């Protein structure tokens, strides 16, 4: 009977065949231990010399790392294993033998591993990170579908930038200029006027020359837009979403979190409502903590965000930033018109901002004024202005960076490990 490593638990004391790769092996004179993986998990195969043909034991000792095999044997309980079971191997069939696999069981430098990212993905820890990434995506669809959101796919090639920045990748679109999308927000706002609540999940591109452990040039973003929604209601949706994702990973990725040696007690504390601190109060807090490199009207850097998040040891919303450091489309704060109705959600443990969101300007005259103040081409944003001409309503939205969120939940040090093939400032291969 052919099965997988994950399903093998359903076949205790039965003979099964598993297609797998050999990740590692060790042997003594009379027994060989094969570390097997098949994409669904990792399992040990035990080959006892006295219980198999001589050629099977010889093969078990000699087969090279990452060779592909069909391994047949009996599934038995093993309480020492993370899985709780192993295979007593009876026969081995080589599908394809590997030669001189470059990532041996010794330590390798980061650049070497990134050069061999196509192979590094096979390692136990990298496999665990990708499984957690997959669970975050699965839980995302579950949350939005259950809450009545419609998925909309905004274009990747755009004629204008939602953020109004210069950090864009430019390309030619026949005889026109086009840019790789930094965000699907403006298109999602249009879709929200048709469907009420919408979300998207797709790649975004930032031509930022950043080399920090938090930044990727290409990353995936989950964005939501909601009509007839105010800022306070939006924050509630955001914290419910993040809490749902964290709980889903805790429930469905126990083994992966164990492999990564993640301190899950920090994740278990994540619950609604999240702490909130205004930008004004955050500045005062930082001053009291001895930070003299930040003044009102300036954006926070990584050390500032870390200090604020560590104070709460939970995800924390920083609300109502100064108007001048935020994009043109954010709604003024009625209690202080020098600030806007926005929030960044900062993850604890130094992982930084994972969500940025705001209430959107819904008044046509104000939005036209903002477009001019930011030096933007009004014609390029005419479709966006139309949304305020024809039945404008209060509405809000937010965007969550997938890779940064996965880094926080999985506890990996650098965001590059959370993308299958990360694009960094100096890396376009593989």
From Swiss-Prot:
GO terms for cellular component: cytoplasm. GO terms for biological process: asparaginyl-tRNA aminoacylation. It holds the Pfam family tRNA_anti-codon. InterPro entries: Aa-tRNA-synt_II, aa-tRNA-synth_II, aa-tRNA-synth_II/BPL/LPL, Asn-tRNA-ligase, Asp/Asn-tRNA-synth_IIb, NA-bd_OB-fold, NA-bd_OB_tRNA. PROSITE patterns: AA_TRNA_LIGASE_II (PS50862). SUPFAM superfamilies: Class II aaRS and biotin synthetases (SSF55681), Nucleic acid-binding proteins (SSF50249). It is an enzyme of class 6 (ligase). One of its GO terms (molecular function) is transferase activity. It is found in: Cytoplasm. The keyword Transmembrane helix does not apply. Keywords: Aminoacyl-tRNA synthetase, ATP-binding, Cytoplasm, Ligase, Nucleotide-binding, Protein biosynthesis. Its EC number is 6.1.1.22. Its main location: cytoplasm. Belongs to the class-II aminoacyl-tRNA synthetase family. Homodimer. This is Asparagine--tRNA ligase. It comes from Staphylococcus aureus (strain JH9). The gene is asnS.
